[in-house]
């Protein structure tokens, strides 16, 4: 296979009801067996319930919940001299959203409520209040990165250069040891 050029990321069509690309991605992550209309109805129903509980608009409430679950750092395995180290690295912006959405959907699927729409609404509302399984997952990932910050100097250069190519902001990383 030729390795000459990098294929660009595909543009995703915005959500038909709210016009949000983020929400369209969320629907795609929730979708099972290609049943997009089912996934859309679950998400819209959950957002409606969430908006009634929070008193905010559907999109605003979703954004708050997502913001509370987005990780800023994670650990990646790096093999150095026969031993494997968990090296903390900053998470790229696109991956932050993807991880947060994936964690929310996983947590909602594990809940014991009646319908998936209700499970999703409850998980999103917990995330908006900084509690719940998805937020706990983010805290665990951050705790792992904090515990392994001694290995931050094992980061490889390709990650740093990749984060700048991906359009990451030039501001300081969330934790000081990643400089």
From Swiss-Prot:
- GO cellular component terms given for this protein: small ribosomal subunit
Is-annotated flag, keyword Protein transport? Answer: no
Q: Is Membrane set as a keyword in this record?
A: no
For this protein, the record's InterPro entries field holds:
Ribosomal_uS7, Ribosomal_uS7_bac/org-type, Ribosomal_uS7_CS, Ribosomal_uS7_dom, Ribosomal_uS7_dom_sf
GO BP annotations, alphabetical order: translation
Keywords, in A-Z order: Ribonucleoprotein, Ribosomal protein, RNA-binding, rRNA-binding, tRNA-binding
Q: What's a Pfam family in this record?
A: Ribosomal_S7
Q: Which domain of life is it from?
A: Bacteria
Instruction: List the PROSITE patterns hit by this protein, alphabetically.
Output: RIBOSOMAL_S7
Q: Which GO terms describe its molecular function?
A: rRNA binding; structural constituent of ribosome; tRNA binding
| Oligomeric form and interacting partners | Part of the 30S ribosomal subunit. Contacts proteins S9 and S11.
Which family is this protein grouped under?
Belongs to the universal ribosomal protein uS7 family.
Please explain the role this protein plays, according to its UniProt record: One of the primary rRNA binding proteins, it binds directly to 16S rRNA where it nucleates assembly of the head domain of the 30S subunit. Is located at the subunit interface close to the decoding center, probably blocks exit of the E-site tRNA.
Q: What is this protein called?
A: Small ribosomal subunit protein uS7
Where does this protein come from, organism-wise? Shigella flexneri serotype 5b (strain 8401)
Question: Top-down, what is the taxonomic lineage of the species of origin?
Answer: Bacteria, Pseudomonadati, Pseudomonadota, Gammaproteobacteria, Enterobacterales
